[in-house]
Every structure is written in structure tokens, then in C-alpha cells.
Amino acid sequence: MHRNFRKWIFYVFLCFGVLYVKLGALSSVVALGANIICNKIPGLAPRQRAICQSRPDAIIVIGEGAQMGINECQYQFRFGRWNCSALGEKTVFGQELRVGSREAAFTYAITAAGVAHAVTAACSQGNLSNCGCDREKQGYYNQAEGWKWGGCSADVRYGIDFSRRFVDAREIKKNARRLMNLHNNEAGRKVLEDRMQLECKCHGVSGSCTTKTCWTTLPKFREVGHLLKEKYNAAVQVEVVRASRLRQPTFLRIKQLRSYQKPMETDLVYIEKSPNYCEEDAATGSVGTQGRLCNRTSPGADGCDTMCCGRGYNTHQYTKVWQCNCKFHWCCFVKCNTCSERTEVFTCK
């Protein structure tokens, strides 16, 4: 039985990396040897592996946050030629797209935000050691507005700092792509921080609101995804500035401008133009669009003309059958008719 438990824990870390482990079970995890477990997780950089070994409870929460980012990416781009489908197939950790494109910018931003969100939530729920509610938001009274800090405010700064230490640790090479990735990581975390919400509860006699107790909460991650998708649509192309004597990349500037104007901190930035994602190409992270569902009448990105890249589409017909017009008869049975509908779906050639 002990061997089966060891094997179960091992596959949780290695394959999924997305399940919470209650603090009471951590002794069993530590007993397995954090070094053994962390050395088996694919895609970790050396500094990330060190964090895993020192905080085996946190690596599972980090994995869940990274997976949440991948899921959100797939939702936001579900109607596009590139739909994030190749992300996370082997591991939720490590670099996924080799081209420094808009799509790479989005994946880095949404992953960094996902890790920060998951760590912050786990701290608030008591699922991580060494963190909890935001202590600085306890006991302060705002007399002018008639409210005070109370409850459990989400400590987003801890989550952001943990995301920064872990996610940014994979950027080892001193090149333009490193500057791009670090900027987009920070942009994703900044969007999350800016969307923190204030919730309040009234206190007073007979339902009056004499005073209010307030606390900060995390936004829904879908909201973060929508905002980052807007940032993706307005992403800024940048180029590297080599200001040191060693000619190493120092900072990024907006490419179209003659001045040394830096991008805004919440801008998503890219250094290479996106491929068209029509054909399968492992180097660009494209799985192609062959076999993808498309909308024959849509003029948008999900339309067959755009999705299929001019190759045309196949038409598939099938009959959908379901029970309908159900009525209750006394006593006591329900009688239904059988309805059917002929449906067509279209897939790219």
C-alpha cells in the first residue's frame, strides 16, 4: 500500500502538476524526497528546480496556475487559426513557442498571471505554508469613507512575488527574447494586480450601514484573460537596445519610433511577426488548421475562408435526435415525441 501511495504522489507531480495537496499530507510528500520528485518534472530550469525542492507544496499550486493560464489561452483563441492547442501537451512548465511573436507574448503573460493568481488564492485558503491573508490590510480604519479593513484580504503581492521568482527564473540567456519574455511576464502580473476588487460588508442597527468592513479579492481569471486578449490585439513590436560596452541587450524600445520610447508596463510586446499558422510547424508551435471546425457563413477568424487558408472545406452531415414536447399524464407518466434535425458541420481540408 505504501508503494502504491508513493507511485500515486509521483505521477501527481510528474504528469499533472495541477492538484492541491492538503497541508496534512505534506509529510508524506516530503518523505518521498523532494529532490527525487523535482528532478523528474520536465521543463524546469535550475532555479525553478531549486524552488521546487525547497517548496514541494508550492510546485503543485504553481502547476495549477500554469495550467489555468493554458486553459484560458485556449479559450481566448478558440476561434483562431492558432488556438494554443499545442501548449501544455508535455509539461505545463518551460518555454513553448520559439518565435517571439504576439502569441508567445500572450502565453507568457497569461501563464505568469495564472501562477500569481493560483498562489494568491492558495494562500488565502490556507493551502500554502508561509503565507496567508494580507497583514497590511488589517485594522486600518478609513474615517472619511466610513470603512475599515477586515476579513481576509488576498495577498496578491505575495502571489506576484512568487510568480516573479519562479516564472522569471527560466529566463537564463541574455538576449532579446529574454527581455521580451520578462516584460510580458510582468505585464500579465500587472493586469492581475490592477483588477483586484474591493468587497465590503455593512454593519449597523436594523440593517443600516453605519460602518463597513472591507477586504480585497481576486478577480475572476476569465476577466484577466479578456484584458490580456485586448492587450494582444494592441501588442507593440519592439527592438532591443544594446547600450553596454559588451553589446548585451539592455532594454526594449518601440520599433516604429525613432526615439528611445519604451513600451508601457502593461503592453504586450513582440520582436518577430507571427506566422500564418496554416500548416503544421513544430518550430513555430503551429499545429495547422487541417480538420478544424469552421463556420461557413462567418466573415470572422472562425469563418471557413479564413480558418482554412484558402484550401477549402469538407461538409459533414448528421442527424441529431432528441426527446421533445414532453407532457405529464395523470397518473403518472411522461410521454414525449421524438424530434430530429439534420445538421451540417464544416471542417478544413
UniProtKB/Swiss-Prot annotation:
Membrane-crossing residues?
none
Q: Which PROSITE patterns match?
A: WNT1
Gene Ontology terms for molecular function = cytokine activity; frizzled binding; receptor ligand activity
Which residue positions does the secretion signal occupy?
A: 1-24
**Tissues where this protein is expressed:** Moderately expressed in fetal brain, weakly expressed in fetal lung and kidney, and faintly expressed in adult brain, lung and prostate.
User: Which keywords accompany this UniProt record?
Assistant: Developmental protein, Disulfide bond, Extracellular matrix, Glycoprotein, Lipoprotein, Secreted, Signal, Wnt signaling pathway
Sites carrying a glycan are N83, N127, N295
Q: What InterPro entries does UniProt report for this protein, alphabetically?
A: Wnt, Wnt7, Wnt_C, Wnt_CS
CDD domains assigned to the protein according to its UniProt record, in alphabetical order: wnt_Wnt7b
The annotated region (Disordered linker) lies at 238-266
| Post-translational modification note | Palmitoleoylation is required for efficient binding to frizzled receptors. Depalmitoleoylation leads to Wnt signaling pathway inhibition.
Localization recorded for this chain is: Secreted, Extracellular space, Extracellular matrix; Secreted
Keyword Lipoprotein assigned: yes
Q: List the disulfide bonds.
A: C73-C84, C123-C131, C133-C152, C200-C214, C202-C209, C278-C309, C294-C304, C308-C348, C324-C339, C326-C336, C331-C332
Keyword Lipoprotein tagged: yes
Give GO terms for biological process: canonical Wnt signaling pathway; cell fate commitment; cellular response to retinoic acid; central nervous system vasculogenesis; chemoattraction of dopaminergic neuron axon; chorio-allantoic fusion; developmental growth involved in morphogenesis; embryonic organ development
Lipid conjugation (O-palmitoleoyl serine) is at: S206
Assigned GO CC terms: endocytic vesicle membrane; endoplasmic reticulum lumen; extracellular exosome; extracellular region; extracellular space; Golgi lumen; plasma membrane
* Comment block on domains: The intrinsically disordered linker region is required for recognition by RECK in brain endothelial cells.
Assembly: Forms a soluble 1:1 complex with AFM; this prevents oligomerization and is required for prolonged biological activity. The complex with AFM may represent the physiological form in body fluids. Interacts with FZD1 and FZD10. Interacts with FZD4 (in vitro). Interacts with PORCN. Interacts with glypican GPC3. Interacts (via intrinsically disordered linker region) with RECK; interaction with RECK confers ligand selectivity for Wnt7 in brain endothelial cells and allows these cells to selectively respond to Wnt7.
Protein role? Ligand for members of the frizzled family of seven transmembrane receptors that functions in the canonical Wnt/beta-catenin signaling pathway. Required for normal fusion of the chorion and the allantois during placenta development. Required for central nervous system (CNS) angiogenesis and blood-brain barrier regulation.
Please name the PANTHER family in this protein's record.
Answer: PROTEIN WNT-7B, WNT RELATED
Query: Can you tell me which family this protein belongs to?
Result: Belongs to the Wnt family.
Please state what the protein is called: Protein Wnt-7b
- Provenance organism: Homo sapiens
